[in-house]
Amino acid sequence: MKISFLLLALVICSIGWSEAQFTDVKCTGSKQCWPVCKQMFGKPNGKCMNGKCRCYS
């Protein structure tokens, strides 16, 4: 039972990972990524990861 729950959680998390779009825009904070993501993908869903913006759909 625990294994099936873990597999289900892994599948759900991997779906979210596949929807993320990396950009080459440098950033120091997530707030800087919101207008970039809005312009590139139509939604202001994004955050700064490792110095670059990552947008979510």
From Swiss-Prot:
Pyrrolidone carboxylic acid modified-residue sites: 21
Pfam family, one: Toxin_2
Swiss-Prot/TrEMBL keywords: Calcium-activated potassium channel impairing toxin, Disulfide bond, Ion channel impairing toxin, Neurotoxin, Potassium channel impairing toxin, Pyrrolidone carboxylic acid, Secreted, Signal, Toxin, Voltage-gated potassium channel impairing toxin
Location of the protein in the cell: Secreted
Primary localization: secreted
Keyword Transcription annotated: no
Expression (tissue specificity): Expressed by the venom gland.
PROSITE patterns the UniProt entry points to: SCORP_SHORT_TOXIN
Signal sequence, renumbered to the chain: 1-20
Site feature Basic residue of the functional dyad, where: 47
Positions bearing the site annotation: Aromatic residue of the functional dyad: 56
Disulfide bonding pattern of the chain: 27-48, 33-53, 37-55
GO cellular component term of the entry, any: extracellular region
GO molecular function, one term: ion channel inhibitor activity
Domain topic, free-text comment: Has the structural arrangement of an alpha-helix connected to a beta-sheet by disulfide bonds (CSalpha/beta).
Record family assignment: Belongs to the short scorpion toxin superfamily. Potassium channel inhibitor family. Alpha-KTx 01 subfamily.
Function: Potent blocker of both large-conductance calcium-activated potassium channels (KCa1.1/KCNMA1) and voltage-gated potassium channels (Kv1.3/KCNA3). Has also been shown to moderately inhibit Kv1.2/KCNA2 and weakly inhibit Kv1.1/KCNA1 channels, as well as 5-hydroxytryptamine 3 receptors (HTR3A).
Protein name: Potassium channel toxin alpha-KTx 1.5
Record organism: Olivierus martensii (Manchurian scorpion)
